[in-house]
Amino acid sequence: MSQRKEKEFNIIEEIGYPAEVIQIIGRTGVHGEVIQVRVRVLEGRDKGRVLTRNVLGPVRLGDIVILRETEREARRLGRRR
């Protein structure tokens, strides 16, 4: 691997992995403060992988979020009673 590519990879590992929001699934949390979204990882070893994650704060389709890791996925939202 070239010096430049290796340096870029180290920066991505330190800061996080950028991912694009491709679908908003719904709200979760006691007060609805967390939004469950599907994201596509843009960089790193899992590039192109689609994950379900919980995001705190306002988010729209097409937004870029930074994931600290790409291993975990959020559980699916349950149906309300």
Curated annotation (Swiss-Prot):
Pfam families: Ribosomal_S28e. One of its GO terms (biological process) is maturation of SSU-rRNA. Keywords: Ribonucleoprotein, Ribosomal protein. InterPro entries: NA-bd_OB-fold, Ribosomal_eS28, Ribosomal_eS28_CS. Disulfide bonds: none annotated. One of its GO terms (cellular component) is cytosolic small ribosomal subunit. GO terms for molecular function: structural constituent of ribosome. Belongs to the eukaryotic ribosomal protein eS28 family. This is Small ribosomal subunit protein eS28. It comes from Hyperthermus butylicus (strain DSM 5456 / JCM 9403 / PLM1-5). The gene is rps28e.
